[in-house]
Amino acid sequence: VGKVSSANHRNKYKAILCRFPLYDKSEVAINAQGWKPASLVSAKANIKGVPLMIFSTHIPGQLEVEESAAAFIAENLISSSASENLFILGDFNNHLNKGALKSFNKVGVRSIWKELPIDTGNISTHKHIESGNESGVIDHIFFRTKTTKVNVTRGGIISSAYNSPEAELQMNRYKKEWLKYGKPLSDHRPIWAEFIFSADNSNR
């Protein structure tokens, strides 16, 4: 769990959870346009002999690539990473291949939405808690491998992420809206993907 709370909001930290040990853990502050502070947490893992470099982030969206948080990540972290298998995921506040996320097209990462493939034009990962308006797909999982073959076999959006009807949470804001929309776990719907790694004609 990182120590930088997004935009100084209460408890908006980035985290990486893993069934396997994590090591070389760190957090990088992002110096870019948009709300501040923004950051990215990272950790390494080794899962059944497959080394992974994992990044989790929450950044402001931007209409342009220049000086955006996405460009900062692409230029300063993804491009310079020597990791064999790199994964970067989180809330990017931009649609795939739009706005600031165009910067990811230049650094060789692939999107689970393109690999599955899933048309993101008519689905959404975020519902604005006050208005109920949908933002479209602004949460993403990107990945890059150098020599190991990897296939995305399954994945999508979890639309049933709600608290139980009996749940009661203390909150100063959005209590009425939280009740109105069925007590969701978050204003963002979780996304997931299954990756199959292959090396020497064997699956992992």
Q: Positions of the model-derived regions?
A:
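Active-site-proximal beta-strand/loop segments in catalytic clefts of secreted hydrolases
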Residues: G2-A7, C18-F20, I30, S56-P60, ...
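Solvent-exposed, acidic/flexible segments
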Residues: R10, E66-A70, S131, S135
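Metal-dependent phosphoester-hydrolase catalytic domains
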Residues: E27, I78-L86, N94-R204
